Regions:
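Positively charged n-region of N-terminal signal peptides that target proteins for export
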Residues: 1-5
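Bacterial N-terminal signal peptides
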Residues: 9-18
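Cell wall/extracellular polymer interaction/catalysis modules
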Residues: 24-166, 174-187, 193, 202-253
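A conserved hydrophobic position in a structured secondary element of the catalytic/binding core
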Residues: 171
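Short internal beta-strands
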Residues: 196-198
Length: 253
């Protein structure tokens, strides 16, 4: 299991306590969600076709792990999946991010309009969102708290429907239905839903662009994200990401 020091050891406990306290039957979470008309509509319209796509990709619709990577400059979210018990993820689908706010670089305070960058999980599903459906990203993590500017790092960062945003990931109502269903299916089986957010893909050309156009403190931060990014690029497996006492990311195999 991927663990991020304080983040994935403590917040994973919070997540599991919130959604499946004392090992409540896995189906109860999904059953509760399906009482909401938007979730039911998402399942009625998307789950059948998604199951066909999953089977075509040799993914068992009844038991899978999901991992998402968001790239701000590229304006995409990659959905990677694997069967439970397998070691390697495979790219399942890529979705466009409909709108953006802020600039490349991490979120450091409330109201800065920034989309966070770092290593996160989906920790809440909102079936009655003002933006159709939404899933909360567990920002701020321990690193964000340590590196915040001022007294408040901000929060309530969502992946949601519609096509407007201040610091979130808007996916349109149509695409959030698919993403919500896929993530809900994983969460319903007590599987964590990881999402990592990067400024861009760390290609050689993009690294040169970042170094040429952004201040050294941002480049230094991105250099702490890159090793875990590179590890996944090579192995298609999530490394253990750790946060040190200064809020810096590093990883272990």
């Amino acid at each position: 299991m991927r663990i991020i020091n304080v983040i994935h050891s403590l917040l994973l406990v919070v997540t599991l306590t919130s959604f499946c306290s004392s090992q409540v039957k896995a189906s109860s979470f999904k059953t509760g969600q399906l009482k909401n008309s938007r979730v039911k509509d998402a399942y009625d319209n998307k789950w059948g076709p998604l199951q066909i796509e999953l089977k075509a990709a040799n993914i068992n619709p009844n038991e899978f792990d999901i991992y998402m990577r968001a790239f701000k400059q590229d304006a995409i979210v990659e959905v990677w999946m694997k069967n439970k018990g397998e070691t390697k993820y495979k790219l399942f689908k890529t979705y466009d991010i409909c709108a953006s706010s802020g600039s490349l670089g991490p979120k450091r305070k409330e109201g800065d309009g920034q989309v966070p960058e770092g290593f996160y999980q989906i920790d809440l599903f909102n079936p009655k969102s003002n933006y159709y459906l939404s899933m909360r990203i567990n920002y701020p993590n321990a690193s964000d708290v340590m590196l915040k500017e001022g007294t408040n790092a901000g929060g309530a960062i969502m992946m949601h429907g519609d096509c407007v945003t201040i610091g979130c990931l808007p996916m349109t109502n149509d695409k959030i239905k698919e993403l919500y269903v896929l993530c809900l299916e994983a969460k319903n089986r007590n599987n964590p839903v990881y999402i990592d957010i990067f400024p861009t893909k760390f290609t050689e050309a993009n690294l040169k662009m970042l170094e040429a156009n952004y201040p050294k403190n941002k480049v230094a931060f991105w250099n702490t994200l890159k090793p875990a990014y590179d590890y996944f690029e090579e192995h298609h497996w999530l490394p253990k990401v750790i946060i040190d006492k200064n809020g810096k990311y590093f990883y272990e195999e």
